[in-house]
């Protein structure tokens, strides 16, 4: 095992230095010695991903999950490989599966958010991917005639499957007309005759509902029950609750199969603050409603009132249970909003209740022990537990950042350092660890800024001064080949999003062909910001 660990450390150094072939070789030899070690497959997956060998990265990510199904990192590796292979739905499912094992894993949460955004963007950015595409084209006279042309159908299928070709097809007037129809905006100067516009579809016939019986058709007991209900409503509005209860009770005696009179009684007890009696009556109303096959909306209303009664008593767990029962019967925005509000409060209550500085210290000490043994994944788990137990301790974020750096998760290390600095701006380790992570990412300018701030706190800090000088020399001697620049840039989620935007790709192509077009594009602040980002990471240069 010692030999395998030595090879793993050697592989980590090679990976950090960008020597990918050497890293893969070291991890492969280590796996031969320790074939059940999930961390080795995880690290080799990262190396393959950096080499752009995404199929192999996926194989190792899958093996990691197989060996250690409760380890979030394995799911991150597998999902990242799937994402690079453009298998976005599978990547999303993998992130979700990982979160079922590690619900608080920040990397998995961030990955899932990015994936959901990518999928939403992909759907939005490709109007030709609409499920009812041909129905839309058939319903508009401008495109209906085009559908008889096989070449037009072939063109539509091409754009449906490969939206990146749109930029090369914009000169085709058929494409502009089609976009006008699909997007619902006028993109050209074609004048349409009013009479050619199809008339609006006839209104949908109202869904037949069981007609309310006319009062004269009602049996005498039901007529009398309704009158009692109206008297109860008048008293309720005046907050004369005793009188309201009396009339609702009489209505219920006259028409015991009508659940409405029972829920009316429950509403009175709710206003009186007798929530236990309110719930008892709502349960009875639901029972009567089920027996008499009442409208599901009335059942939902009774469940919602039970939920509201628990919410008033600050019993959020029970409130959520009954709000969800109400939503299962009939979904309304009001109940959904109340349910989400209760969930938010409950989550915060559980978070606060979990805080315990003494247990945080225990977890921190366990993390320190694991870190000293070189078991960085285990150390990270202990530090994460300590943070949940004491989220305002800046040093815990610093310690976890050190773990992330050892695991080559530099972006997460930077994020933890920034939280550490926010909580304790005078803690120098927050700045030096942030700088070290940025330096490892070869972002020397930002690393120097962080080292500079550390030196402002302590001018004698050798770690800060040495790091600053090292970054200066690295920046001065930098001679990256274009592939390295591109690889580093494309690891940035913001850059990935910009480069996957068909509109931005069209703009970049236009800038290459016509440099004068740049000034026009820079007038748009959103586009200018994206261009600046691509310049900052070295993907484009403007002279």
Curated annotation (Swiss-Prot):
Question: GO terms for molecular function, please?
Answer: Hsp90 protein binding
The UniProt record lists the STI1 domain at 130-169, 492-531
Q: What keywords are assigned to this protein?
A: Cytoplasm, Nucleus, Repeat, TPR repeat
**Does Nucleus appear among the keywords?**
yes
Record has Chloroplast as a keyword: no
Q: Which InterPro entries match?
A: STI1/HOP_DP, STI1_HS-bd, TPR-like_helical_dom_sf, TPR_rpt
PROSITE patterns per record? TPR (PS50005), TPR_REGION (PS50293)
Q: Which parts of the sequence are annotated with region: Disordered?
A: 189-235
Compartments it resides in: Cytoplasm; Nucleus; Dynein axonemal particle
GO CC annotations on file: dynein axonemal particle; nucleus
Q: What is its main location?
A: cytoplasm
> Where does the record place Basic and acidic residues bias?
205-235
- TPR repeat segments: 4-37, 38-71, 39-71, 72-105, 225-258, 259-292, 260-292, 300-333, 360-393, 394-427, 395-427, 428-461
Provide the function of this protein: Acts as a co-chaperone for HSP90AA1. Mediates the association of the molecular chaperones HSPA8/HSC70 and HSP90.
By what name is this protein known?
Stress-induced-phosphoprotein 1
**Species of the source:** Xenopus laevis
Question: What is the organism lineage in this UniProt record?
Answer: Eukaryota, Metazoa, Chordata, Craniata, Vertebrata
Query: Gene name, please?
Result: stip1
């Amino acid at each position: 095992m010692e030999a395998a660990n030595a090879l793993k450390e050697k592989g980590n150094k090679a990976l950090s230095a960008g020597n990918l072939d050497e890293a893969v070789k070291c991890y492969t030899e280590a796996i031969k010695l320790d074939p059940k070690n999930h961390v080795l497959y995880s690290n080799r997956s990262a190396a393959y991903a950096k080499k752009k060998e995404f199929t192999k990265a996926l194989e190792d990510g899958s093996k990691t999950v197989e060996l250690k199904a409760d380890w979030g990192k394995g799911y991150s590796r597998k999902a990242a490989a799937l994402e690079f292979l453009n298998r976005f739905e599978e990547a999303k499912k993998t992130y979700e599966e990982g979160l079922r094992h590690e619900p608080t894993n920040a990397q998995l949460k961030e990955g899932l958010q990015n994936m959901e955004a990518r999928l939403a963007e992909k759907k939005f950015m490709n109007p030709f991917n609409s499920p009812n595409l041909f129905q839309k084209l058939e319903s508009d006279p401008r495109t209906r005639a085009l559908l008889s042309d096989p070449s037009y159908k072939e063109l539509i299928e091409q754009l449906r499957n490969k939206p990146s070709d749109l930029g090369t097809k914009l000169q085709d007037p058929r494409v502009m007309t089609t976009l006008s129809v699909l997007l619902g905006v006028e993109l050209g100067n074609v004048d349409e005759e009013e009479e050619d516009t199809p008339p609006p579809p006839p209104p949908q016939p109202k869904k037949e509902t069981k007609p309310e019986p006319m009062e004269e058709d009602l049996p005498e007991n039901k007529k009398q029950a309704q009158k009692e209900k109206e008297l109860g409503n008048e008293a309720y509005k005046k907050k004369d609750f005793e009188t309201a209860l009396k009339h609702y009770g009489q209505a219920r005696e006259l028409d015991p199969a009508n659940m409405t009179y029972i829920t009316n009684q429950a509403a009175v007890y709710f206003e009186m603050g007798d929530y236990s009696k309110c719930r008892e009556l709502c349960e009875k109303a639901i029972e009567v409603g089920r027996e008499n096959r009442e409208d599901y909306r009335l059942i939902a209303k009774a469940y919602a009132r039970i939920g509201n009664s628990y919410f008033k008593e600050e019993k959020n767990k029970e409130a959520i249970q009954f709000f969800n029962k109400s939503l299962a019967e009939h979904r309304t925005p009001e109940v959904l909003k109340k349910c989400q509000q209760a969930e938010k409060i409950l989550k915060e209550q559980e978070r606060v209740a979990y805080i315990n500085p003494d247990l945080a210290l225990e977890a921190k000490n366990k993390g320190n022990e694991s870190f000293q043994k070189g078991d960085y994944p285990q150390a990270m788990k202990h530090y994460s537990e300590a943070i949940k137990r004491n989220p305002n301790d800046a040093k815990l974020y610093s310690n976890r950042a050190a773990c992330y750096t050892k695991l080559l998760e530099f972006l997460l290390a930077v994020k933890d350092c920034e939280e550490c600095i926010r909580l304790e701006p005078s803690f120098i380790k927050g700045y030096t660890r942030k700088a070290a992570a940025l330096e490892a990412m070869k972002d020397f300018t930002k690393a120097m800024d962080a080292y500079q701030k550390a030196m402002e706190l302590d001018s004698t800090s050798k770690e800060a001064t040495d790091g600053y000088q090292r970054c200066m020399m690295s920046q001065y001697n930098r001679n990256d080949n274009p592939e390295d620049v591109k690889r580093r840039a494309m690891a940035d989620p913001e850059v990935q999003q910009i480069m996957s935007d068909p509109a931005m790709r069209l703009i970049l192509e236009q800038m290459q062909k016509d440099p004068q077009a740049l000034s026009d594009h820079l007038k748009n602040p959103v586009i200018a910001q994206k261009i600046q980002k691509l310049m900052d990471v070295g993907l484009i240069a403007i002279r």
